[in-house]
């Protein structure tokens, strides 16, 4: 059978499938014959997908719908016919994917850019439990932890996400919990400076997950160890995060504190933690968060309030973070009650619908759906108080809901022959009167009394007046039940006649003995079988029925049949009585005893607040008269503090913060002192835009406190303030306009917002912007120099390798011979002594007659067959040209631009440093650090410039060595200088036009000190701008360098010589006058706009990329190269019929395949 097979190599999530562009994986149509083993099929498929056959044990065939692996037993003709309609999946097994991922994490450095893709793929591969287990067994979590600690940025965030996913499995959680050092490193990651907010959030989330799973000691131990290492108080860094600008970080941090309090081993430990956090200022920070309206954050604050408390007096503990409910909170509760009215209306409509459904079911005589509403409303009745709360008082329909619930319960136990007897007519009414419910009489509950139904039971309900018989149901029983009932009556008819006279005598005696009763509310049974009752005169004929004896002397106290209900609570509990009726199926010879409702002996209590309910079973002493119990014996009176008890167990928890704009009640102060004194409200004013304010708030959350920040800037302490912090301060530094607006509004009557206060603070430090620029240059220049030097060294070594490579010489010699042979007899192309480098691309494009290889492939194959290349490894050229692939990625033009930028930055920093030295005091550490550093950097930059120029010259000579031209290096330098002058002239024109459009009134203030006219041999251009002003007193123009103006100081003569390489100035002379020509910045000499030069010259990237392509062509092994069709070797083997079939399917010519096989 021919079945399509798709390859999924573990990265199927990369391609997103859409209806317009469905997911497309590599696929092939493969023939399954049912006799070949699955392993052999996988080998053939791996060969097709160009995967090494030795990895056959790592792959398996899978059914895409059942996800079951295809075994040999599956390859039956019937199943193959079914599979032909769908397809199979060829994918790596989970243990193989785990081996590959762990191996990549082990071999690749955590700081490598390739590790990011590997970590990103992990969470998509965790859908298989087998993969997760294999990953954990092979130590993948250890490698993941190394990535978390050593990596930065998104890689670190992806690694934390993967670790969080592994903790979702039991084995992963146990692995994390069994390694305390992992928790220590996670805690140190949270407290480190310069970590991304997303990384910090995920690390905190992992910590409180560990804490919730019995990991309190692990997290607490990590906090103490970190405090000992950093010599700081425990949890101080976490409390600092509560005031950060990132809301998610604040929320996770507060959640961690709540988890620590919830999982503390004992109350004493919780009190110690709360005391320590209070000293660190957590209460002050939480108080400052009153303006936060985030619902989750407010919930966590309320949770922290419920867990925390500090003693105000010696009698007990009382919360210090609670406040009384304000008027707005009460309005909010009222608003919630109003919002519940639609729900109540909906439930009322649903109840009416259920009544009609029940009525319809009773009429049909079926019990099909009697359980569904019972279970639903049982669950609802348990939660109705929580759902509605203090709802409007007229909720009688909920009481009727209880009636229906109990009625349905009775239907589960009482299987009466007549279904309609389960309900009376009043229960099935569509409408009801709430006032009548309050005045309705209570019925006798028989739920606690056993009901015997061996014989049909009926209840005779006495009439309310002599002229009105009891109401009868209009329902008729089924025929079968009616026949059975008649048969039973006939059998009992004879016995009834004999006992008829005796029962009449007993009834007369009982009526005589009955006395009038006080005002009572009757409780009638919910089971009323009215179909069998014709009138009260026929009661003597039914001797086997239970009789309800009622006193009719007082008509005003009797109940009407209309108000019958299963359960109704009496309004007047002092006047209620309960009648016990036993339904035993036999006539009673004695009158049933009457029990009055038990009355409590204790006086009622009215709490000051609504308290939490305590669900218990009440015991009244009147139930056990004459029996000695602990409750009717003497119990001592014990007093308790009512106010404290109400605060601790009231139903509503007072909030730590009030709603925005709501008045604060007169509670206790946040520190536990006396009442809060009202202060005049001062308006908080924000001057900056919302975007600027948010950026400054986020930045302040990552920076240390103000005093530590100022001290670090003065001392240039990189341990307290990193490069990221310095750069963020410079990027968010307030402008002069913003500072002027802030100073204008700053007064004692106005409170500025936090970003404005930070701007005033940072502006108060003298020359702080120049100082930050100097410090940033000192921190960045080391990495910049390292990157530039590595690029220069790579290009220099690559040039030397090309000049000394034996393989390249042999290859070029062979290509020259082959080219002359191809062009033999041609007048202009033949008899060549060499060829241009661009000809190599044409040699790659020329294919042989079988279209299986190029001219370059043939030359490389021939080199392997020659004696000089025989026996050499196919990686010999990679050893000879080891640096060429890396050099092909380097843009030497950008390297020159970077060197030029370093020199320009150095000149600006020197001027700024001189200004700071003239204005600062003698004890400033700046005077000892910066001048010495700048002197050292000057020597390094000189050496860097020399090395760059030498490498550029050598690169020019190497390119000219392989691709000779008639142009000299001096001509090339002159063209480069002319190109720079043209670009500078165009840039100055654009800048002048922009200045004129922006401000026409300031047309003369363009900071241009002079014009320079440069005449060359080819063109004459006028260059405006870029003039060095030698005026030592003109220091105000440093901030207005729009036209590349460099304000030079005569004391920087060494810097002048550094900025002006002599090879750029063909006609330059010593600058003895007051003004001289500014030289262009250093740039690579390999980007020329001359058309003739570009036709012959190669850029650095293009030149080395060409040779990198040649090295890549050598990667193909000789065996694979010689197995191509053009060299007479067959692909398939006649001994393997499956390979012959696959080759026939590929080529479409089975006859040719058979010929080639034989």
Swiss-Prot record:
Q: Which organism is it from?
A: Dictyostelium discoideum
Ranges where the DAD domain occurs: 1134-1158
How does the record comment on the protein's domains? The DAD domain regulates activation via by an autoinhibitory interaction with the GBD/FH3 domain. This autoinhibition is released upon competitive binding of an activated GTPase. The release of DAD allows the FH2 domain to then nucleate and elongate nonbranched actin filaments.
Q: What happens when the gene is disrupted?
A: Null cells grow normally during the vegetative phase and, when starved, migrate normally and form tight aggregates. Subsequently, however, null cells make aberrant fruiting bodies with short stalks and sori that remain unlifted. Aggregates are also unable to migrate as slugs, suggesting it is involved in mediating cell movement during multicellular stages of Dictyostelium development.
> What gene is behind this protein?
forC
Is Isomerase found in the keyword set? Answer: no
Q: What does the record list as coiled-coil region(s)? A: 479-515
Question: Which PROSITE patterns does this one have?
Answer: FH2, GBD_FH3
Q: What is its quaternary makeup?
A: Interacts (via GBD/FH3 domain) with activated Rho-GTPases.
The family classification in the record reads: Belongs to the formin homology family. Diaphanous subfamily.
Q: Give the function comment from the record.
A: Formins play an important role in the nucleation of actin and the formation of linear actin filaments.
Please give the InterPro entries that the UniProt record associates with this protein: ARM-like, ARM-type_fold, FH2_Formin, FH2_Formin_sf, FH3_FHOD1-3-like, ForC_N, GBD/FH3_dom
Q: What is this protein called?
A: Formin-C
Listed SUPFAM superfamilies: ARM repeat, Formin homology 2 domain (FH2 domain)
A GO molecular function held by the record: actin filament binding
Regions of compositional bias (Polar residues) in chain numbering:
417-437
- Which SMART domains does this one have? FH2 (SM00498)
Q: Does the keyword Cytoplasm apply?
A: yes
In this chain, the stretch annotated as Disordered covers 8-29, 417-523, 990-1052
Q: Name one GO biological process term.
A: actin filament bundle assembly
Query: Per the record, what is one GO cellular component?
Result: cytoskeleton
Residues in FH2 domain copies: 601-998
Primary localisation category: cytoplasm
